[in-house]
Amino acid sequence: MDRRVFLRLSAAGLIGLSIGPAADAAESLHGKRGKRGKSSKDGKYSVIILGDTHYDTAPDTYYHTGYSDPNPTREANHRKEFARNAEMWADRCPRLVKRAACLVDENTKLVYQTGDIIQGDTAGVDAQAKMLSDAFEYLKEAMGEVPLVTVAGNHDVRGKKDSEAREGYRKFMPERLSKELGTEVEGLDFAFRIGPDAFIAVDFNKPDDETVKKLLKETEGARYTFILCHAPVFPYDGSKYSNWYYHGKDKDHQARDTMRELFAKRNVIVLCGHTHSTEFLDWYGDGGRITQMTMNSVWKDDATGTYSVMAEGIEGYGAISGSELFDEFRPGVKGYSYARSAGCYKMNVSDEGISIDFYAGDSTRPSAHFVLR
């Protein structure tokens, strides 16, 4: 299917498996949101992006009353995170969100948050849903009339009982996203479009490959295809948890390899978070290309509010952990940089290409510029 067919089918409302007619989504993104929702005839627009935010507040009893974990060490670590979150949301994170809101202009079509919008770790369905609602409405109030979309992160579905936390997410988020997109969102994997471009949201917690394959099929011919996923598609360079990527925990790599090949043949751009880092990876293989941009808004201390590259270049990928895990992927890497920086991001999209400006902390000028296409 070529791009002209994709556009014709989009206008006819024949794409968007999980959210219904894509034409409805496009109309809500372009035609019913006032000046900021005005469609650009030349296909040029911007997307404001926030990485993990881990919304929380003090005292920890506000959201975490009744929370416990059967593993005392793990619970102690989680409670350290509560304290970290409360401290950063008392000052730094509101400044970061305010800075992100200032990046919105008349060409901005979407605000995207990469998942882990909340800390999670609540004691039940309603508590998880309330925390999600409070976080979403906080960001929505700051960003104004521009549609806000998020994907499911591991913290968004983590609680005293993960099954109840996930139920809380399902209770709140699909309905709230339906309001943002102007059409029904039924599940955690869904697609919508902005003009000639396809956006496919993927739940990495419980991958539904068959649904994702259908979404890829139904959006063939898009100018650009963006994969919105909380975790990366490729392993990230860290001292631990490097296997926290799409299908990275599977003992059998067949599903991982199959989906990576499908993504590569579509030349997708992956917009993700999870690792609390600002990382750019451009990879060629499997008959195509995957460009991955990992983003972070966990401004945990003063140092993460500045941009400082820790590793870059082909040999830099995996250099921090030193794990053999990266040997499989390194030959396809054509561009790479890694920083433990937090901030906000502005993605600019046009026929000429795609770029992202990164604003560390609440800086008024770009700290880094990434060319994705």
Predicted regions and their residues:
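Histidine-centered catalytic micro-motifs
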Residues: 228-233, 270-278
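Short, solvent-exposed loop/turn elements at domain surfaces
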Residues: 45-47, 55-61, 209-212, 301-304, ...
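Residue-level marker for buried hydrophobic side chains located in beta-strands
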Residues: 47-49, 113, 150, 227, ...
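N-terminal active-site segment of His-dependent metallophosphoesterases
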Residues: 28-126
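Short acidic, glycine-rich surface-loop motifs adjacent to enzyme active sites
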Residues: 221-242
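Extended active-site neighborhood of metal-dependent phosphoesterases/phosphodiesterases
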Residues: 37, 66-79, 83, 122-224, ...
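N-terminal export signals
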Residues: 5-28
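Active-site glycine-centered loops adjacent to acidic/histidine catalytic or metal-binding residues
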Residues: 52, 115-116, 153-154, 230, ...
